[in-house]
UniProtKB/Swiss-Prot annotation:
The gene is GTF2E1. It holds the Pfam family TFIIE-A_C. The modification Phosphoserine is found at S268. It is found in: Nucleus. It comes from Homo sapiens (Human). This is General transcription factor IIE subunit 1.
């Protein structure tokens, strides 16, 4: 059977006491937070955030301040959501028994502090010497008193001392204590009224409660969301397939059909026009190399050469080098013949040499298209012969006399003896040799 003296509801006096204290000694944020806890016995932190519209950091600072002063208590509970996730929530409530004790303690501490200040700042006489500025208390009055003159004199300079007005208290401590008692009287009255109140355990340690205002707003929001979902159901169905799908994330379907590749390639080639031959196949990109005119002068058929190039899309590298060397040799021989014709006739020995070179050049003329497929060994031998021929030192005419090019290069006085035509031929030959060297 329950004790008739135990109260199952919080008395109005305790609620007024909490409101008076929180509004008298704390800020407006603390008062708002405590008002919610007065109206609702145990409130979750998230619900307080929803009601007060505070920032979470600001609300926690306010609650931690009240909790540090023992006005409120905190209880942590672990809750399991519908999806199985566990979350921790803080619930705050007021323990009114602790609240009353804390208020009594703080008021008593304030009263003792005021009484201490009153006792320390009692109107005690203090003396100061106007000459040496020495100060004396009322306990030193027997040393300052001069019985001959009946005055208080300084013990150092024997000058009559004066009462120190700066040491007088600014306010009367007894007046301050009376004002404190007058202002705190309503709180004292509430404390006397709640002196013998005995609260039940479920009031001192309440269970979490649902706030009606928040419950109504949540129900209204749920109803609105349900109506919106019913109204836009077909829209969600249309977007149902737009969500992320991870079933076929690592599935790749590759189909390889080798039969149709040749037909597709042939059809693509038929649809495209024939590409124009690049300039590096039609003409030489090296300055001084053979061109169409040189090829005609050298007895090379341009059409036959192009047919051979088209017939062999990928000629051998050795064959290309050989043809280039043959044509360069042809040009060198023609230049040498021109220089000899411009100067005096050469000796019979030199003539025999030029004839042998001409015959060798004729023997080494570019092969006909029918002779392209000769044996690899024969091509290597011909290439070696060509390199040996190119390595021969050309002949330069100096005042009608033949000299080797290397000899003229080492003897500058021979260049001074040349005629203008011989000097021009000498310079042209040097340029061709330089171009042949870097090709």
């Amino acid at each position: 059977m329950a004790d008739p003296d135990v109260l199952t509801e919080v008395p109005a006096a305790l609620k007024r006491l909490a409101k008076y204290v929180i509004r008298g000694f704390y800020g407006i944020e603390h008062a708002l937070a405590l008002d919610i806890l007065i109206r609702n016995s145990c409130v979750k932190e998230e619900d307080m955030l929803e009601l007060l519209k505070f920032d979470r950091k600001q609300l926690r600072s306010v609650l931690n301040n009240l909790k540090g002063d023992k006005f409120i208590k905190c209880r942590m509970r672990v809750e399991t959501a519908a999806d199985g996730k566990t979350t921790r929530h803080n619930y705050y409530f007021i323990n009114y028994r602790t609240l009353v004790n804390v208020v009594k303690y703080k008021l008593d501490h304030m009263r003792r502090r005021i009484e201490t200040d009153e006792r320390d700042s009692t109107n005690r006489a203090s003396f100061k010497c106007p000459v040496c500025s020495s100060t004396f208390t009322d306990l030193e009055a027997n040393q300052l008193f001069d019985p001959m003159t009946g005055t208080f004199r300084c013990t150092f300079c024997h000058t009559e001392v004066e009462e120190d007005e700066s040491a007088m208290p600014k306010k009367d401590a007894r007046t301050l204590l009376a004002r404190f008692n007058e202002q705190i009287e309503p709180i004292y009255a509430l404390l006397r009224e709640t002196e013998d109140v005995n609260l039940a355990y479920e009031i001192l340690e309440p269970e979490p409660t649902e706030i009606p205002a928040l419950k109504q707003s949540k129900d209204h929001a749920a109803t609105t969301a349900g109506a919106a979902s019913l109204a836009g159901g077909h829209h969600r169905e249309a977007w149902a397939t737009k969500g992320p799908s991870y079933e076929d994330l690592y599935t790749q379907n590759v189909v390889i059909n080798m039969d149709d590749q040749e037909d597709l390639h042939r059809a693509s080639l038929e649809g495209k026009s024939a590409k124009e031959r690049p300039i590096w196949l039609r003409e030489s990109t090296v300055q001084g190399a053979y061109g169409s005119e040189d090829m005609k002068e050298g007895g090379i058929d341009m059409d036959a050469f192009q047919e051979r190039e088209e017939g062999h899309a990928g000629p051998d590298d050795n064959e290309e080098v050989m043809r280039a060397l043959l044509i360069h040799e042809k040009k060198t021989s023609s230049a040498m013949a021109g220089s000899v014709g411009a100067a005096a006739p050469v000796t019979a020995a030199n003539g025999s040499d030029s004839e042998s070179e001409t015959s060798e050049s004729d023997d080494d003329s570019p092969p006909r298209p029918a002779a392209v497929a000769v044996h690899k060994r024969e091509e290597d031998e011909e290439e070696d012969d060509e390199f040996e021929e190119v390595a021969d030192d050309p002949i330069v005419m100096v005042a009608g006399r033949p000299f080797s090019y290397s000899e003229v290069s080492q003897r500058p006085e021979l260049v001074a003896q040349m005629t203008p035509e011989e000097k021009e031929a000498y310079i042209a030959m040097g340029q061709r040799m330089f171009e042949d060297l870097f090709e």
